[in-house]
Swiss-Prot record:
<dbReference type="InterPro" id="IPR012678">
    <property type="entry name" value="Ribosomal_uL23/eL15/eS24_sf"/>
</dbReference>
<keyword id="KW-0689">Ribosomal protein</keyword>
<dbReference type="GO" id="GO:0019843">
    <property type="term" value="F:rRNA binding"/>
</dbReference>
<keyword id="KW-0694">RNA-binding</keyword>
<dbReference type="GO" id="GO:0006412">
    <property type="term" value="P:translation"/>
</dbReference>
<comment type="subunit">
    <text>Part of the 50S ribosomal subunit. Contacts protein L29, and trigger factor when it is bound to the ribosome.</text>
</comment>
<protein>
    <recommendedName>
        <fullName>Large ribosomal subunit protein uL23</fullName>
    </recommendedName>
</protein>
<dbReference type="GO" id="GO:0005840">
    <property type="term" value="C:ribosome"/>
</dbReference>
<comment type="similarity">
    <text>Belongs to the universal ribosomal protein uL23 family.</text>
</comment>
<dbReference type="InterPro" id="IPR012677">
    <property type="entry name" value="Nucleotide-bd_a/b_plait_sf"/>
</dbReference>
<dbReference type="GO" id="GO:0003735">
    <property type="term" value="F:structural constituent of ribosome"/>
</dbReference>
<keyword id="KW-0687">Ribonucleoprotein</keyword>
<dbReference type="Pfam" id="PF00276">
    <property type="entry name" value="Ribosomal_L23"/>
</dbReference>
<comment type="function">
    <text>One of the early assembly proteins it binds 23S rRNA. One of the proteins that surrounds the polypeptide exit tunnel on the outside of the ribosome. Forms the main docking site for trigger factor binding to the ribosome.</text>
</comment>
<keyword id="KW-0699">rRNA-binding</keyword>
<dbReference type="GO" id="GO:1990904">
    <property type="term" value="C:ribonucleoprotein complex"/>
</dbReference>
<dbReference type="InterPro" id="IPR013025">
    <property type="entry name" value="Ribosomal_uL23-like"/>
</dbReference>
Amino acid sequence: MIPDPRDIILRPVVSEKSYGLLDENVYTFIVRPDANKTQIKLAVQKIFNVRVTRVNTINRAGKRKRTKHGWGHRSATKRALVSLAPGDSIEIFGGPGA
């Protein structure tokens, strides 16, 4: 069964690096860990009505963190760097140079 596109893309990444990539028409999203590049591409195209040229994915391991009661773990995440065709953009952060 093909999941709903809004279930694949969880949220955009808000960081200095992701803001810097906006100038290169590359957008960064947190995605489901079991999503593949084809599913991510189709989901972004359907949700934002843009043309995707490339998708790169990064699996980030969760960090081990000290808590009051011992050790805990942050959740592992999967990020997708989505490159759009020239002329297309997504207004999620106000756009490049905003």
